[in-house]
Amino acid sequence: CKGKGASCHRTSYDCCTGSCNRGKC
């Protein structure tokens, strides 16, 4: 995964689900 999601501000970008998520894959 390259960087974080554009819409993800306080939450990290989950590369597995392709959405904002607090946890890591």
Curated annotation (Swiss-Prot):
Domain of life: Eukaryota
GO molecular function, one term: ion channel inhibitor activity
Major localization listed first in the record, in broad terms: secreted
Keywords from the UniProt entry: Amidation, Calcium channel impairing toxin, Disulfide bond, Ion channel impairing toxin, Knottin, Neurotoxin, Presynaptic neurotoxin, Secreted, Toxin, Voltage-gated calcium channel impairing toxin
Family: Belongs to the conotoxin O1 superfamily.
Domain remark text: The presence of a 'disulfide through disulfide knot' structurally defines this protein as a knottin.
Designated name of the protein: Omega-conotoxin MVIIB
Provenance organism: Conus magus
